[in-house]
């Protein structure tokens, strides 16, 4: 699924401040956003790091294109970390959500295995 958002920004607005205001995306933090982020910070024992952040570019012509980082790899000090998540809502069944994350991580693992064998 892809959503395209377009808009015009007042002159003099710093594009970095715009990005900081919209990320992490509400679809990954919950709503209301700031209360959800506070709860996540209090409940989760590990930082989400760049998970749920953005990757993209801001062009010299002030164009901007970004994607939300929901399935990610990080290679640091000879250690590869990969992450995925699920959308938990009031009617979620924890076991089903865990299975969904397992499937997503399985796809990342397969990508690693494919890269290693090629």
Model-derived features: positions:
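Conserved hydrophobic core element of enzyme catalytic domains
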Residues: 1-118
